[in-house]
Amino acid sequence: MKILIADKVHPSAISGLENLGHEVTLNPACTSNELHKYLTGVEVLVVRSTRVVAETISKANSLELIIRAGAGTDTIDVEAASSQGIYVCNIPGKNAVAVAELTFGLLLAIDRRIADGVIDLREGIWNKK
């Protein structure tokens, strides 16, 4: 299976797909406007934040699956893909640990009034209380 990854992904994801016998092309510099140029013969497209619009989908001659490597599919024209018989899926929940870490970090920042301290420091105030 020919796979195009149009955004940055961890190298282990690429090697894992290659070990399964897939032909993987990595092109993280590809923009939404030029994406259609790289889709010739591609069966699976993997994106993170690159937009996949109806015009791009209509030019994909062998595309069968679009994978959004993240939560949501808001960067993909799902209706256009469906009308072409192309499946669209996402990978929700992979960022759950990072979200939990951020939440606890923000709770600590609120509890310790870090933002208030930063504002004071920028104004030249050193309040030791």
What are these regions (language model features)?
Residues 1-89:
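An N-terminal-biased, well-structured beta-alpha scaffold segment characteristic
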Residues 84, 92-129:
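Phosphate-binding beta-alpha-beta segment of Rossmann-like dinucleotide-binding domains, i.e.
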